[in-house]
Amino acid sequence: MQQHLYFLGIGGTLMGSLALLAKDLGHTVSGSDAKIYPPMSDLLANADITVQ
């Protein structure tokens, strides 16, 4: 069952990694963070995960 998951603090190592895992499992993923920097910003962008 596909779900839309929204991650707060998605730019961090833990939350970003969980977001990438959820995307790999077929879920729709988006999230937000106050500040996000490479390499996590690049990884999320390459996975087509929307970050606000």
Residue ranges of each PLM-predicted region?
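N-terminal leader/targeting and accessory segments in enzymes
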Residues: 1-52
